[in-house]
Amino acid sequence: MHQLLIVGNGFDLTCGLKSSFVDFYKERERLGRQWSAGDESTIWDIILYDSYQESRSRWCDIEGEIAHWVYGADSEPAAISKCVANWHEFIGDRPTNATYNYQDLEYPDIYSYACSKIGCQIDCGSFASLLKNELISFEKHFSTYLTAQLQQSDDYIEQAAKWGNALLHDEGASSGWSDDSSILNFNYTNPWIELCGKAAVDVRCIHGSLADDNVIFGMDAHKAMEDDVARPFTKAYRILENGVQGSSDARRLAWRYDPYEENTRTGIIKIFGHSLAAADYSYFQSIFDTVDLY
């Protein structure tokens, strides 16, 4: 019988790694508060800082903030549309070399930063391109941060081995059980190959990994793939764009019941350290549909 283990950031946190987005944000809060040309600030630092200042819960949820800006939520339109419309109303017929007082706008620092990068003739296309390019830079900064945390950790691998073995080989391994396991890893770290061996366990780092230098942030693709602005920011699009290992062969993560094959179905699904948040809705829907878990 096959088992699927799904691990989220709670696994790395349990192993003592400062891998949460909150920990990362603490390192970059200054860049959002007071950016200057030539530093390593990105527009996402400013967006998240503004969200934090307004006490919105999305400040520690980059995926939720991405969705807010490029897709919207419920009846709320995408923030990018509102932002561009307000900007056009603000500049009116002023000449292109005019000086603007950004403090009169709802997002003064965001407008100021955007104009410093792409000029003041802002439209949805140029703004979306800026958001996408800066998201890639933001991901690189996160990779650098997380790599440093791994290097500073004295016992991450030891803790990962302890918890990983407990999860893979717990008391659920009863009669009819086999060692056939798959791991859906939502983390950017990947201790599993070192712990289990390449042949023993099928591991998918669905959002990329530090080792492959393809870490991604993105919003859930559910309902968003038909939106031209939002599509490039969806996880499904970014996974394909970045060539994340195993992304096109998700069928092997979970096995449907086959009456002609004994003990091949996915009989156990274990979830550890994952919030089941909306940003990963599509993954779980696909898995649960495959095993008919309803």
Predicted regions and their residues:
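Short catalytic helix/loop segments, enriched in acidic residues and glycine
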Residues: 21-45
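Active-site catalytic pocket residues across diverse enzymes, especially alpha/beta-hydrolases
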Residues: 28, 196-199, 291
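Solvent-exposed, flexible loop/coil residues
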Residues: 15, 21, 25-28, 210, ...
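Extended, H/D-rich, highly charged conserved domains that either
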Residues: 36-249
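Extracellular beta-strand/beta-solenoid scaffold signature
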Residues: 251-255
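SIR2/sirtuin-family catalytic core signature
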Residues: 1-18, 24, 256-294
